[in-house]
Structure formats: C-alpha cells, structure tokens
Amino acid sequence: MSRKYFEEEVIQQTLDYNYAQHSDADKFNIAYGIDKNFLFGCGVSIASVLLANPEKALAFHVFTDFFDSEDQQRFEALAKQYATQIVVYLIDCERLKSLPSTKNWTYATYFRFIIADYFSDKTDRVLYLDADIACKGSIQELIDLNFAENEIAAVVAEGELEWWTKRSVSLATPGLVSGYFNAGFILINIPLWTAENISKKAIEMLKDPEVVQRITHLDQDVLNIFLVNKARFVDKKFNTQFSLNYELKDSVINPVDAETVFVHYIGPTKPWHSWGAYPVSQYFLQAKSNSPWSHCALLNPVTSHQLRYAAKHMFNQKHYTSGINYYIAYFKRKLLE
C-alpha cells in the first residue's frame, strides 16, 4: 500500500534550471511551497541562502500553482548567476481547495505535504522553508545534522511555555507543553515521515469538521499534533521570527543577532512591501540587490487590508502625506467592498 497521499500526477509540469557543478547525490535539497503572491519573496529567499552559503552544493525546489514567462526568466537567471539548480513544479491544486484556509493562509500552505510525498523515494532529507524567510548565515549545521531513530523532523519552537500550554489544551495534545513549533522551517526526515504516513494522516485530520473547529493555525497545528515527541527542537537561530508590524508598537525588541541564520518575517507586512522599510528588512533587501529582482520595485498596497497597514507604517515612518493618501485610498476601497 502506498504511503503517499499525493502521487506525482498532482505535478503538471516541471522546469529544471540546472547550472550546478555538483552531482545530485551531493546536493542539500531546500523546498518552498507558494502561490503567485510569494514568488517575489521566494526568489529573493533563494538568493539569500546562496549569498550566505557560497560554494555549498544546494538544490532548490519551488512548488507553485502559478509561474509566468517573467518568473521563468528570473528564476533561470538566478540559477545561472549562482551556478545552482532550481526546479519549479507546477501543481494541480484541486484536491487542496476543499481544505480550510484563512485570509493569511491559502491552500498553498498544504504544498509542504506534496513536497514530502514527492521526495519520498528520492532523498533522505529536505529542508522546507517559508518564502518570507531570509538567510544571513551558514546552514552547514543543518547539512551535517543526523536524525535520531524516532525523529521525523527538526523544528524550532514558537513562543514559550505559556503558549505551548495553551496549544496543548486547545489541541487536546498534552505533549505540546514540551514545545510547539512554527512550521515555516522544517527539516524533514523523509523516510520516517513516509513510514509514519504523516501527509495522509494530516490531510485526513484537516477534513474532520470537529478538528477544524479546534485548530487556528491549520496544518501547523496538525503537524504539531502528529510530531509531538517525534521532532527535534533546534536553536531559534534557524527560525528567528519577527513581524514588521511589531514596528508599530511603542517599544520594539529586535530578536535578530549575529548568530541568526534565518530571519522569518511573519505577519501580513513583508519586506517586499513598499511600507516595510525598517532596518530588520536589510537581510531581504541585500539579497534582492544581489539577484535578478534587483531592479524590481517593492510592491505597493492593493487590498484594503494592505492599504490600512501601509497608512499606519507611513505615519510611523513620519511620511505623513503618504499616510494620509493611503488612508483615503483605504476608505474608498472599503466603500467598494
């Protein structure tokens, strides 16, 4: 019986931009699962990993449901620029659209299950990263990591004991008091993930109406349930989370330091947004300037949600005229909704 939930038929097309000098056997595989709104971020995220890890044998895998000719040109140029391999997989999303989604999480969040299943007979380990992550340090420690017998993944804890306790109660999983992780960074032990049938179990749970009522973080909650006591918690430097909307608070503590490897820009405001100009965005912007996206403008607000945040950030940055204009645009947009 197949241990995969997703067979390879969900992949409609594969584009392989291979300019690497290394053999496939030597490569450390890094994967992203995104929709069209994160292609910009994904390209720059890949550039940041390559910029911080020159000479390493890496291969990047982008699973998406949208990829136009402009994207093709830029991603191929990126692979060529850094003499690396980038493989793009066009996904048929029909089976995912019935699963729960929110304003901030679309069905693309479930691509990580397709990723794990795709690699089930191809490699032992895959590093899954969210596309809003920028790299600023060496990933050699992850390349060298050896899993213990029962470890399905390596992850980074989110929050502290109080948050873990709340999640353990909400999700009826007492073991979560020992740690609840953010699913934006997962180093997957592919053979054990496959043997434990994680993708299939997770998708089935996400179809259960009773479970859907309890969960607030979709597949992240479900993965925490299935990986309890079966995941290795690694240092927070591998998933240092910061929301650019924290900059709107009176007091801001920036957790990024010299040891940080991955900066994870959580929340709705991203460093590729024109209103996200803060010092902590520098890791994204540096990679952008060293990529085929170097001449691309940062994205302006489109939705009412974005216009409201753009207005707040413009006032926070003392760009008052822009702030007023964004508020006017926000109220006009709200009238049309």
From Swiss-Prot:
Tagged with keyword Membrane: no
Top-level taxon of the source organism: Bacteria
Gene ablation phenotype (knockout): The mutant has no detectable galactosyltransferase I activity. Mutant synthesizes truncated outer core region, does not express the O antigen and cannot invade epithelial cells. LPS contains one galactose and one glucose unit.
DXD 2 (motif): residue ranges: 219-221
Location of the motif DXD 1: 130-132
Residues annotated as binding Mg(2+): D130, D132, H264
Pathway terms, separated by semicolons: Bacterial outer membrane biogenesis; LPS core biosynthesis
Family assignment from sequence similarity: Belongs to the glycosyltransferase 8 family.
Official protein name in the record: Lipopolysaccharide 1,3-galactosyltransferase
Organism expressing this protein natively: Salmonella typhimurium (strain LT2 / SGSC1412 / ATCC 700720)
